[in-house]
């Protein structure tokens, strides 16, 4: 039986490109090589597409993918050169120009099946402000927030935020993930500085009420028939779960399943599946919740391309449900092919 070609697209132009490399290396080691032949393509920080390694068997633990530090520009190709009939693309890309609909649109123009959510749901979920407004219309609870858009009166935003929220607040670029550019502010001075920092990553800024809460995550998998995992908890040894804690210091542990009561567990799974459908998602996502000390549940974020590193919550959640990493990849590929056939059918 011939092997299915799986193309890993990784790297990218966003500030989350280092996470993408870690995720892609984890995927390339988890693949079942009796069923797949893996090709990898690196997208550099400046946007070049570089042809990199190919694998017909599991790479060694010392094998590393190309990065911006080891780039070989003589291997640069045209973006459209990744096309291969029958291949499935796994865009292991995080953040802007990766999970915001850009790559998804490019792959649809190439007529290639790809793992993950479609153009619309990717772009909606990428923007935290838009996501909140869509989920509000679906009746899903969220923490109170205000918004600052670059060019607006900053002093007025500060005054409106102080009137609507209480310190501490968290300031986030609307179109970033992996906790990049997020700051905690406990005064007007810190809030101003946090907004200015976030503006270096995005022109749309979300300011959220800080809540004393546990961070609980639910994995989602499927197309029209979506399935959810039991919730898992991010147990932190830090003030908040920032990029440094997630990917460098690794100052977190995972509790799977989370030790929460059954009603909260059920509610989170229902909210997660509702959110997935509300944005028109397909393939996969991870829903991140806050569980307040009073038992109140808030949906914090919908992540359409969660991390796939060896310590990432998403694959661990599915492993607990009885779907190991290799089987998860195989199912994601199947879902990608299913959606591709459906999209193509709609164009006839």
Swiss-Prot record:
One of its GO terms (biological process) is peptidoglycan biosynthetic process. It catalyses: 2 D-alanine + ATP = D-alanyl-D-alanine + ADP + phosphate + H(+). Mg(2+) 1 binds at residues 288, 301. It is found in: Cytoplasm. InterPro entries: ATP-grasp, ATP_grasp_subdomain_1, D-Ala_lig_Van_CS, D_ala_D_ala, Dala_Dala_lig_C, Dala_Dala_lig_N, PreATP-grasp_dom_sf. Its cofactor is Mg(2+); Mn(2+). GO terms for cellular component: cytosol. GO terms for molecular function: ATP binding; D-alanine-D-alanine ligase activity; metal ion binding. Residues 132-334 form the ATP-grasp domain. It is an enzyme of class 6 (ligase). ATP binds at residues 162-217. It comes from the Bacteria. Its main location: cytoplasm. Gene3D superfamilies: 3.40.50.20, ATP-grasp fold, A domain (3.30.1490.20), ATP-grasp fold, B domain (3.30.470.20). Its EC number is 6.3.2.4. Binds 2 magnesium or manganese ions per subunit. Keywords: ATP-binding, Cell shape, Cell wall biogenesis/degradation, Cytoplasm, Ligase, Magnesium, Manganese, Metal-binding, Nucleotide-binding, Peptidoglycan synthesis. Pathway: Cell wall biogenesis; peptidoglycan biosynthesis. Mg(2+) 2 binds at residues 301, 303. Cell wall formation. Belongs to the D-alanine--D-alanine ligase family. NCBIfam families: D_ala_D_alaTIGR, PRK01966.1-4, PRK01966.1-5. This is D-alanine--D-alanine ligase. It comes from Streptococcus equi subsp. zooepidemicus (strain H70).
């Amino acid at each position: 039986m011939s092997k299915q070609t799986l193309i890993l697209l990784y790297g990218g132009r966003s500030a989350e490109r280092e996470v993408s490399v870690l995720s892609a290396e984890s995927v390339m080691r988890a693949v079942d090589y009796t069923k797949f032949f893996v090709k990898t393509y690196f997208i550099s920080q400046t946007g070049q597409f570089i042809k990199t390694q190919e694998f017909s068997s599991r790479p060694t633990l010392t094998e590393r993918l190309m990065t911006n530090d080891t780039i070989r520009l003589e291997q640069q190709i045209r973006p459209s050169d990744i096309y291969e009939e029958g291949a499935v693309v796994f865009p292991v890309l995080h953040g802007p120009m990766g999970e915001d609909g850009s790559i998804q649109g490019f792959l649809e123009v190439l007529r290639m099946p790809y793992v993950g959510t479609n153009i619309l749901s990717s772009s909606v979920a990428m923007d935290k402000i838009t996501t909140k407004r869509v989920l509000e219309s679906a009746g899903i609870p969220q923490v109170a927030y205000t918004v600052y858009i670059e060019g607006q009166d900053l002093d007025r935003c500060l005054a409106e935020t102080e009137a609507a929220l209480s310190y501490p607040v968290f300031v986030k670029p609307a179109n970033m993930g992996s906790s990049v550019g997020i700051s905690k502010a406990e005064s007007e001075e810190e809030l101003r500085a946090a907004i200015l920092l976030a503006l270096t990553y995005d022109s749309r800024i979300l300011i959220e009420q800080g809540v004393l809460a546990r961070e609980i995550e639910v994995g989602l998998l499927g197309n029209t028939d979506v399935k959810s995992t039991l919730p898992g908890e991010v147990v932190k040894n830090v003030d908040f779960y920032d990029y440094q804690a997630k990917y460098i210091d690794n100052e977190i542990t995972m509790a799977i399943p989370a030790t929460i009561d059954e009603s909260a567990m059920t509610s989170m799974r229902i909210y997660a599946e509702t959110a997935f459908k509300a944005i028109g998602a397909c393939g996969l996502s991870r829903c991140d919740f806050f569980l307040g000390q009073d038992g109140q549940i808030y949906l914090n974020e919908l992540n359409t391309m969660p991390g796939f590193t060896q310590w990432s919550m998403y694959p661990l959640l599915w492993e607990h449900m009885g779907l190991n990493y290799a089987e998860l990849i195989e199912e994601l590929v199947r879902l990608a092919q299913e959606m591709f056939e459906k999209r193509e059918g709609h164009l006839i």
